[in-house]
Amino acid sequence: MTAGRPGPVRSDLQVVLPAWITARLLVAAAWLVVRLAGPGGGGVPRPVERGLLAWDGDWYQSLLVHGYDGVSVEGVRFFPGFVLVGRLVDAILPGGPGVALVSLANVSALVAAVLLHRLVLLETGNRAVARRAVWALSLFPPAFVLVWAYGEGLFLALAIGVLLCARREQWWTVALLALAAGLVRPTGALLAVPVLAAAWRPGVGSVRLPARIAAVVAGPVGVGIFVWWASVHFNEAFIPMNVQRSLRGDPVNPVRRLVDGVGELFGGEALGDGLHIVAVAGLLVLLVVLFRNWPARYGAFAAACLLVGLAADNLNSLERYALNGVPFVLAVATLASRRRLGPAVMAFSAVGMPFLAAMAWWGSYVP
């Protein structure tokens, strides 16, 4: 086995498990800090009372137990993939729906990290960079949701699987994984961007054309299947998007939204949308690093995810949407490989991730 090729899964786990465990210890520390801080004022319980089922986790649990007809119409904005797999886990794992969803989220995050390790090894042949990428994913500030009962872990496992299989030109496997990703998160539609770039490189011609076409369209098709079903079931066209729009506002020009956000840094929203703009600034730096150091398809996917996140009046959860654009962590790994920046980058992540988790459990940050 050469130094740059992945070996058995056991060797991947030796790299991944320390980062995976560390992330969960940091999230546990954040939970403990918020719990020790006491209950919320005015008798209103804080999200910390819900533990790993806080925020969207409650929605996913309700959907698993009651289905879309058993929750308010707002629930239709959550795509069904995570819930459907959660039901399978619940059928075989004791402990109830909450345990099933949390277990699925955490195991999926572990799988995502293993696949990322293999992807970076395949792209770079550099085990040090692959290890840093795993740590970057595990400690990426919004990655605390990979510990909670959120669908991000499952989506990332599928999305990284898409990128890995596209790199290997396993187009039918890409199509299957992308279709599943589209049923987990609407961001699955954006997987068409990196897959298209990988499938239609110069000189490829028409070899295996049906498989490559299927790979490109599978993500949007997965999203479309649920949107079609929900539209028919609730007798309202595009109802998942309409519900999401009612919460995040109408689509806006991303550039204009960014300019407006800069002004919010100095107004009453300095601790609200203003902080999201600071995050955007950091993500733009990562985007430049990504385009300069990695194949363009990764930068294109990350850029598409960021643009979609910015194309809304309400920027809540923007950082989590950026996490779906998983190549951002490749840029973090690149920066962490530089001697002067490495310690600062990892220290920022090690502080930022539990800080955001604590803010979310406190109720002052929407994950």
List each language-model region with its residue ranges.
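Transmembrane-helix motifs of polytopic, lipid-linked glycan transferases
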Residues: L88, S103-E123, V285-L286
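Short hydrophobic/aromatic helix or loop-helix immediately within or flanking a transmembrane segment
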Residues: G51-G95, P254-L258
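Transmembrane alpha-helix segments characteristic
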Residues: S138, L290-A312, Y321
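Membrane-lumen/periplasm interface segments of specific transmembrane helices
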Residues: A23-P39, G43, G51-L53, A192-R201, ...
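Multi-pass, polyprenyl lipid-linked donor-dependent membrane glycosyltransferases
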Residues: L104-S108, L122-E123, R132-L164, A180-L191, ...
